[in-house]
Amino acid sequence: MGHRVLVYVGALFLILFTIFPSSSALISSPDANPPYPKAISDLKESIVKGLGFQSEEVKVSGFDIRDALVGHSVSYEFDLEIDNKVLPFKLLEDVNRWEYVDLPIFQVEQPSENGLVPMRNKKTSSDDVLPVLAPFQLSGPMELWIQDANNMRLSLPYDVDAGVLKKVILADGAVVTVKGARSVSLRHPIDLPLPLNQSSNEFASGLLSLAEQLRRASTDQESPVLSLRIVGPTSLASTSQSPDNKLKLKRLAPGLVELSSMSKDKRSLSTIGANAMTTVLTPREFTTMWPITSINGSNANLLGFEKLLTSVLGPKAQEKGSFKVLKAKVAAQTFMKIGFGIEKKLKEADVEGLSFPEWRTKPETMRMHFEVLAKVDGENVIPENVMRVDPIPLEDTIAQNVITGNVTMSKLPIIESPPSPFTL
C-alpha cells in the first residue's frame, strides 16, 4: 500500500514539473519588450513634453537605438555684451560623417534569472568615445588652467616629468601645441575696442586687429593676463623639435609651472598639417591670430565670425567704443540622430476646420514622424533640434468615375483632334 502511495506522489510531481518547468517561465522574456536605456527614455519624455503632448494622449513609437546615428562636431558658444545687452550665440559645425556606434549609454542592464541586477565591479568608462579638438597652437603671454588631465604629457621638446599640472603660465614668446583637448573656454570676460579695422574681404582683418590689441594689453603689467581653461588635454609640446628652440620650464608651486622661450626673438611658425601654409600679409608681419597661432586670417570660420560680429554690431562696428565678450567656449561634441513617430487620436473638433472630399473617409488618427538631433553629454542625451519629416509622400488616387461624375462613355462629348498631315 505504501509503495503505491509513493508511486502516485511521484507521478503527481512529475506531471507538475512537466506543466510548470520553472517559475521563471511565468516571467515574460525581456527580449519580447526590450526596455529603453535610461538616457533614451529621458530623451523621449522631454521631447513629448516639449512638443506639447501629454503622455496619455499620444502613442510614441521608434527611438530604436539600433537605428541611432552618431557623429562628432565642434560647437562654438559666445555671449557678447553690447550696449548693456547680452546676446548669446551658439554655432555648430556640420557633422561630416554619421556612423552606427554602440555608445555606453545605449547599453541596458538585464536582470539575472533570480531577478537581481548584477553588481558592476567597475563603471564603464566612455573616455574612448569622447571627441577631441584638432591640435592647435597657443602663444603667450597667457595662463592655462588644466582640468581632467592627470596623464598629460609635457614635451619641451623632450619629455619632462612635472607631475599633475593644474596651471601653466606661458611667457611672452612661448608657443605650445595642445593635443587631445575636449574644450577650451574663456575664464574671465574681456573688453575689446572698436571700431573694427576691416581692410579686406579675403582676410579677417577686423578680428586680427582686435587680437593684436588684446596681445599688447596682455604684455602690460597693469592689465590682467588672458586666462583660458582647457579640459582633457593629453599633451603640451613645443612647436619646434630643435634643441635651439626649446622651452624653459620653471616650477613655481606644486601643479604650477611657467614656460618661457629660450629664443624669444625667433618666431615659431605653425607645423600642424603638412599642407598648411602661413599667409603673409606684409613682408614683416604674418597673419596668424593671437593667441591661437595655428590659424591665420584666411580661415573660413574666422571669416564667418567676423561677418557675424559685423552684422550684430551694425553701425557701431565703424564707431569708436567697445564691447565685452562674457563667454567664449569651443568644444568637441558627440551628437546623435534618431527618428520616432507619434500617433494621436483625433476628435471631432480637430477635423471640423479641415475640408475633405465626400468620397474620402475622415481620418481617426494623426501620425507624425520626427527626427531629433541630440547632444550626448556624459550619461545624458539633450535634444538640440526636433524636425518633422515625411518619410513616405502621400498621394490620392481617384477613380475615373469619380472624376467624371459617374457618367457613361456614350454621354461624353466627342472631341475631334485637329487634322495632321502625318496622320494615315
From Swiss-Prot:
UniProt KW Endoplasmic reticulum keyword: yes
Subcellular location: Endoplasmic reticulum
GO biological process: endoplasmic reticulum unfolded protein response; pollen development; pollen wall assembly
Alphabetical keyword list: Endoplasmic reticulum, Glycoprotein, Signal, Unfolded protein response
Glycosylation sites: 197, 296, 406
Tissue: Restricted to pollen grains at high levels.
Signal sequence extent: 1-25
GO cellular component, as recorded: endoplasmic reticulum
Knockout mutant characteristics: Normal growth in standard conditions, but altered pollen surface structure with pollen grains adhering to each other.
Induction of expression: Highly induced during unfolded protein response (UPR), also called endoplasmic reticulum (ER) stress response, in a bZIP60-dependent manner. Induced by tunicamycin, an ER stress inducer inhibiting N-linked glycosylation (at protein level). Accumulates in response to dithiothreitol (DTT) and azetidine-2-carboxylate (AZC), ER stress inducers disturbing disulfide bonds formation and acting as a proline analog, respectively.
Protein role: Involved in the regulation of pollen surface morphology, probably by modulating the secretion of proteins and/or lipids during pollen development.
Xref: PANTHER family: PROTEIN TUNICAMYCIN INDUCED 1 (PTHR34454:SF2), TUNICAMYCIN INDUCED PROTEIN (PTHR34454)
Designated name of the protein: Protein TUNICAMYCIN INDUCED 1
Source species of the chain: Arabidopsis thaliana (Mouse-ear cress)
